[in-house]
Amino acid sequence: MAELLTLARPYAKAAFAYASEQGATDNWSNALQVLSAAVQDEAFSAYLNRPELTPAEQVKLFAKVLGEDQSQAVSNFLTLLADNDRLVLLPEIAAEYEQLKSQNNNNVDVVIESAFPLTAEQEQLLKSALEKRFNSTVTVSVEVKPELIAGVVIRAGDQVIDDSALNKLEKMRTRLLA
């Protein structure tokens, strides 16, 4: 996963830079979401990855998926990906693009994993602290993961704050076995 993200990041940055320059970040966002969903569809992906398909034919398939929403710039982007055998990266490119878009809008998407459901007050306290830490507006989504035992894991982009009992026990185990 990290390797795919590393490969996808330059493409996402280039797409975002171009879209920002053209004032078309939302159009590109929509196109990348549709393309990402298409690549994740098993039947479409199986057809797309047939060895006899040329990169140009692969791009034509995506043109059918996007229909009228496909601009020449998106077509050129798909051609670049197809020529470099990188169409499989579209979900990661779309995710990274959305992250860049959020950063540009001074917004950070945060996932809080908690061993127990958070109260509205706890969620608001965490949100306020995270907004102060990131100096941005924070959009919070909470996931309950009982396997953490206690505490929380906070994920914001590529940053992870792990204050879970599971993590602390794992560190203790490592020290004892060393």
Curated annotation (Swiss-Prot):
Molecular function in Gene Ontology: proton-transporting ATP synthase activity, rotational mechanism
Main localization, broad class: membrane
InterPro entries: ATP_synth_OSCP/delta_N_sf, ATPase_OSCP/d_CS, ATPase_OSCP/dsu
Bilayer topology: Peripheral membrane protein
GO cellular component, one term: plasma membrane
Pfam families: OSCP (PF00213)
Keyword Membrane attached: yes
Keyword Cell inner membrane: yes
Subcellular location per the Swiss-Prot or TrEMBL entry: Cell inner membrane
Keywords associated with the record: ATP synthesis, Cell inner membrane, Cell membrane, CF(1), Hydrogen ion transport, Ion transport, Membrane, Transport
Protein family membership: Belongs to the ATPase delta chain family.
Subunit structure: F-type ATPases have 2 components, F(1) - the catalytic core - and F(0) - the membrane proton channel. F(1) has five subunits: alpha(3), beta(3), gamma(1), delta(1), epsilon(1). F(0) has three main subunits: a(1), b(2) and c(10-14). The alpha and beta chains form an alternating ring which encloses part of the gamma chain. F(1) is attached to F(0) by a central stalk formed by the gamma and epsilon chains, while a peripheral stalk is formed by the delta and b chains.
Function noted in UniProt: F(1)F(0) ATP synthase produces ATP from ADP in the presence of a proton or sodium gradient. F-type ATPases consist of two structural domains, F(1) containing the extramembraneous catalytic core and F(0) containing the membrane proton channel, linked together by a central stalk and a peripheral stalk. During catalysis, ATP synthesis in the catalytic domain of F(1) is coupled via a rotary mechanism of the central stalk subunits to proton translocation. This protein is part of the stalk that links CF(0) to CF(1). It either transmits conformational changes from CF(0) to CF(1) or is implicated in proton conduction.
Name by which UniProt lists this protein: ATP synthase subunit delta
Organism: Acinetobacter baumannii (strain ATCC 17978 / DSM 105126 / CIP 53.77 / LMG 1025 / NCDC KC755 / 5377)
Lineage of source species: Bacteria, Pseudomonadati, Pseudomonadota, Gammaproteobacteria, Moraxellales
